[in-house]
């Protein structure tokens, strides 16, 4: 079932209050996890510190698979932030949704293409920034004409394609999952005998959606590092 988004206009611009709320909640959750995991560091990690160190090691492995550590080590914090943010954002809409006067307030922020495409644009812009910073503007721009100059138009198209696919892949998977969860919940509420089937199917789909949300967080972070490697490594 489709629900309206709570929109407000300010200075000629339209803002989605639901997106703003859920983005803020996602940031707060990630911040709280990070603080809780690093508040009292110990030589023998336990609990949250152990989890956070595992996340760092996991992201370190992603970076090492795309570029050498001397080049990619500086992106460790970026990778950890991305994978935690996208994972939490993907999970928020799974347990429940909140509707007020026909408006959808509680959902996964990544179920909105505006959010995922904005995140993709920011990530791709960051790869360009580090490409210029680490290779120099002239050497960076020459990459668009290597190995032959006629590839320049194709490489420009590739930049737009990478941005679109990075954002839309994440949006499509999370949005489709929430739509199906809503349909199964509606089936369980309104269709009698089929209600039990709907409820059990919803639990199975929620478990699958957790898996999908986790994989999408990994893919988004991995592709970010792949794009970064293409911009900052001299052998690409």
Swiss-Prot record:
One family name in Pfam for this protein: ATP-synt_A
Superkingdom field: Bacteria
Gene3D superfamilies noted in UniProt: ATP synthase, F0 complex, subunit A
Main location class: membrane
Key word Ion transport present: yes
Membrane topology label: Multi-pass membrane protein
GO biological process, one term: proton motive force-driven plasma membrane ATP synthesis
Subcellular location: Cell membrane
Parts of the chain that traverse the membrane: 17-37, 75-95, 112-132, 174-194, 208-228
GO cellular component, one term: plasma membrane
Record-stated family: Belongs to the ATPase A chain family.
Protein role: Key component of the proton channel; it plays a direct role in the translocation of protons across the membrane.
UniProt-recorded name of the protein: ATP synthase subunit a
Gene: atpB
